[in-house]
């Protein structure tokens, strides 16, 4: 049998009775009505059915409301997201697909040598904490468990057993976690269809939940899909799209060296395989610093969509691993069109070409949708090396123009690459007059001509927010994924009216990982800090591309009042948070993170540079 989304779908049996039970209505923290729902799911070959636990939340009002089948990430219960969408007028059903997640002393997330599972492993502590919370609720209602119960014969579907494997045994596709998770979502969809207080139905998934959402978008009962930080290609996370690692990965596939289990995963689970068969419009929201997926390949999945009309894609470059306020606006407009029937035009993505001239300079030309009115167009640029992880780029806006400055929906600008850079990257982003925002693919180009005019930069930041993103997003973000405007990096004034960059969630820059900004051997790090009262900040240099260790930190005091305080740090001043060892050299760094110890005491940062 040739494995594909079509053959997978032929295996789904949704004919079994739901036997749904709804419990007493309660109020959410935001005052919306919610109910626990229990229903029967997949009938296993050996007998016994999956017992699905879900949470239904509805907006105020007596009329039938459009609904979202909401699939959060594995470490989130979705409660905040349910309140967020209820306030927008949408009902939500959140089925638990994880089952047992693994609590303290029992967590067992399987790992492999793949980068996909390396990235997942970094979240184990968060998932274990959520598991403890769920475990505490298990027996609060007459012994009923507030999570999905998989029969013993389907123990592999429990997250504590499976993790999120980037492989699939083709001989036993029906006995896989991915198949069971999709079954949970599909039976939850069947339940939503039975409710008289629900009208149109969409699906939204975040990270792991987003990968599952791709698998069910083939259903004709789904009107639209919002996919967040999930674009497939997880089997390729160890092989970046541009560079030596990518070339090596492609060679091994051509030579037939890729394991059958990984081939099966690509064909039967990965979003890039499902996209051509999708029946509904899709909005892809991509946080460019999230290591769960490869943002470089997100557009590759988007262009494969079988139903592109009314679909869209948007990036968030400065909101860390979260979706920022521009993407939230896109989500609102997208759902209003496809679930509420409003006449909202969704512009087509931007076309972007990047060419290298004879003198080594770059020319970038962006072309927007001819049927949409552009408010502003921005072009972003970054430099890097071969095989670099896409989430570690220092994006910089090199040009912003008003729509009236464009001719025939086109705009061209130039850029002078740093002579030591191996690759140049660019993308364009446009905001339209109706509020919708869309982007181009990320274009990567190996630089062939080494110009000599560009010199290395000592100044990492003079105090502008360009190049900085939110560091610790989870405490600030709705559902750990939606970041609203007040948490974004901002410039605030200190002594003498001089401005610096600040966020209550801390700020991170990957500029020290860029060839243009990398530290010379033996360099010291200098920055100016300002505070109105005595406080302290934690300065961290991260040395791992995927955030799985290698954090060297120091806490420095900042005296309140007076002038800006100058801080100078040597590499040896920063200590490994696990071993206590000193940082060897700043040139080993991937990112600098600056966190306020007191989030109620703003500490702007300016004049970050190498000495």
What do the predicted segments below correspond to?
Residues 482-510:
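Short carbohydrate-recognition loop motifs
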Residues 15-62:
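N-terminal cap/lid segment of alpha/beta-hydrolase-fold proteins
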Residues 337-381, 396-408:
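Surface beta-strand/loop "capping" patches
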Residues 53-54, 64-73:
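Short beta-strand element of the alpha/beta-hydrolase
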Residues 79, 84-87, 91-182, 232, ...:
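Cap/lid segment of the alpha/beta-hydrolase catalytic domain
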Residues 100, 500-580, 595-604, 609-610:
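Extracellular ligand-binding interfaces
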Residues 278, 284-286:
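Short beta-strand/loop motif that positions the catalytic acidic residue
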């Amino acid at each position: 049998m040739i494995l594909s989304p079509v053959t997978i779908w032929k295996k789904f049996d949704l004919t079994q009775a739901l036997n749904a039970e709804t419990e007493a209505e309660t109020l959410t923290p935001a005052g919306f009505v919610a109910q626990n729902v229990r229903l029967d799911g997949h009938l296993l070959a050996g007998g016994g059915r999956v017992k699905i636990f879900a949470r239904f939340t509805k907006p105020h009002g007596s009329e039938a409301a459009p609904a979202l089948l909401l699939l959060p990430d594995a470490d989130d219960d979705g409660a905040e997201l349910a309140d967020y969408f209820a306030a927008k007028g949408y009902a939500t059903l959140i089925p638990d697909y994880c089952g047992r997640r693994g609590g303290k002393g029992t967590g067992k997330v399987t790992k492999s040598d793949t980068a996909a599972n390396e990235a997942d492993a970094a979240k184990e502590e968060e998932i274990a904490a959520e598991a403890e919370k769920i475990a505490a609720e298990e027996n609060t209602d007459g012994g009923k468990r507030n999570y999905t119960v998989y029969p013993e014969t389907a123990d592999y579907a429990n997250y504590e057993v499976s993790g999120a494997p980037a492989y699939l045994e083709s001989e036993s596709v029906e006995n896989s976690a991915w198949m069971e998770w999709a079954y949970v979502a599909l039976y939850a969809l069947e339940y939503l269809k039975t409710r008289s207080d629900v009208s149109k139905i969409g699906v939204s998934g975040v990270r792991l939940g987003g990968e599952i959402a791709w698998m069910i978008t083939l259903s004709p009962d789904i009107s639209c899909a919002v996919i967040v930080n999930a674009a497939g290609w997880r089997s390729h996370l160890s092989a970046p799209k541009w560079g030596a690692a990518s070339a090596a990965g492609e060679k091994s596939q051509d030579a037939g060296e890729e394991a059958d289990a990984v081939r099966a995963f690509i064909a039967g689970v990965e979003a890039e395989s499902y996209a051509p068969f999708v029946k509904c419009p899709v909005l892809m929201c991509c946080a460019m610093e999230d290591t769960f997926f490869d943002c470089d390949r997100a557009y590759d999945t988007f262009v494969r969509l079988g139903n592109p009309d009314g679909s869209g894609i948007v990036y968030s470059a400065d909101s860390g691993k979260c979706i920022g306020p521009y993407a939230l606006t896109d989500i609102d407009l997208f759902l209003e069109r496809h679930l509420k029937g409003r006449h909202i035009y969704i512009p087509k993505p931007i076309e972007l070409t990047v060419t290298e001239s004879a003198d080594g300079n770059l020319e970038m030309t962006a072309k927007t949708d001819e049927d949409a009115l552009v408010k502003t167009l921005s072009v972003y640029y970054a430099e890097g090396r071969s095989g670099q992880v896409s989430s570690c780029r220092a994006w910089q806006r090199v040009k912003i123009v008003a729509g009236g400055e464009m001719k025939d929906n086109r705009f061209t600008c130039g850029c002078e690459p740093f002579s030591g850079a191996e690759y140049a990257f660019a993308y364009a982003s446009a905001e339209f007059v109706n509020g919708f925002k869309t982007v181009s693919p990320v274009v990567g180009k190996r630089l062939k001509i080494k110009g000599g005019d560009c010199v290395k930069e000592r100044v990492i930041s003079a105090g502008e927010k360009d190049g900085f993103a939110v560091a610790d997003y989870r405490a600030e973000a709705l559902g750990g994924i939606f970041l609203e405007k007040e948490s974004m990096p901002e410039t605030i004034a200190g002594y003498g009216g001089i401005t610096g960059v600040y966020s209550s969630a801390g700020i991170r820059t990957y500029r020290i990982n860029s060839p243009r900004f990398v530290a010379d051997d033996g360099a010291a790090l200098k920055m100016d800090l300002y505070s109105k009262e005595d406080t302290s900040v934690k300065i961290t240099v991260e040395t791992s591309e995927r955030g799985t260790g290698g954090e060297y930190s120091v806490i420095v005091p900042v005296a309140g009042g007076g002038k800006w305080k100058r801080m100078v740090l040597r590499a040896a001043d920063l200590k490994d948070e696990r071993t206590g060892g000193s940082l060897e050299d700043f040139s080993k760094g991937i990112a600098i993170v600056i966190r306020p110890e007191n989030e109620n005491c703003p500490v702007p940062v300016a004049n970050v540079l190498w000495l």
